[in-house]
């Protein structure tokens, strides 16, 4: 049997070994806990970095969109000098300028087209029958009276040339007697014209013929 004095150092060694094991276990546990904590912190840090990267990307996208929407200031364009238009060749104009309200152009507005004008239909005038037509429609008696009146009036006209006085008889002049001879067609009117023509001839021309 071993001596009793040796029991105490053995027990002390065993107790020291147990304590050493406990310390080792605690250290390993602490190391594992620390590793777990460090792993969690690393994951959180990575997540925070990822979130920061996403936020940065969103901010960059918003900035690019805002820059696209911002109005772009264009450089002022230099004003070019007005081009000179060559004068048009003169066009032949009418002899008389138009003064109608629908053709005269107002300043700054184009010339208005002329409105179609309706020509007024002229009523046919009643033409006076000439002496030739009147003689065709005369009876033989009226034609005979005209043949007697006209030579008398012609003789009065020849004798009165150069005289300033107007020849009149019964308020009838040589001109009125000539018109009656040419245009009257009734026998009574022509008979009175013949009598007045002979009276006018006797009044002014018979004396000169006798001389």
From Swiss-Prot:
Bias type Pro residues, positions: 83-92
Ranges of Acidic residues composition bias in the record: 24-65
Region (Necessary for nuclear subcellular location): 154-181
Record bears the keyword Phosphoprotein: yes
Localization in the cell: Host nucleus
Region (Disordered): 1-95, 107-140
Biased composition (Polar residues): 129-140
InterPro entries, alphabetized: Adeno_L4-33K/L4-22K
Post-translation changes: Phosphorylated in vitro by human PKA and PRKDC. PRKDC inhibits, whereas PKA activates the splicing factor.
Region entry RS-repeat, spans: 160-180
Keywords tagged on the record: Host nucleus, Host-virus interaction, Late protein, mRNA processing, Phosphoprotein, Viral capsid assembly, Viral genome packaging, Viral release from host cell
Induction, as annotated: Expressed in the late phase of the viral replicative cycle.
Gene Ontology biological process terms in this record: mRNA processing; viral DNA genome packaging
Residue spans crossing the bilayer: none
Pfam family, one: Adeno_L433K_22K
GO CC annotations, alphabetized: host cell nucleus
Additional notes on this entry: All late proteins expressed from the major late promoter are produced by alternative splicing and alternative polyadenylation of the same gene giving rise to non-overlapping ORFs. Expression of packaging protein 2 and splicing factor is controlled by a L4 promoter distinct from the major late promoter.
Domain statement: The tiny Arg-Ser repeat region (RS repeat) is necessary for the splicing enhancer function.
Subunit: Homooligomer. Interacts with DBP; this interaction occurs at a unique vertex during genome packaging. Interacts with IVa2; this interaction occurs at a unique vertex during genome packaging and seems to potentiate IVa2 and 33K oligomerization.
The protein's role, per its UniProt record: Promotes alternative splicing of late transcripts by promoting splicing at weak 3' splice sites. Required for the temporal activation of major late pre-mRNA splicing at late times of infection. Induces the splicing and expression of the late capsid vertex protein.
Entry's family note: Belongs to the adenoviridae splicing factor family.
Name of the protein described by the UniProt record: Protein 33K
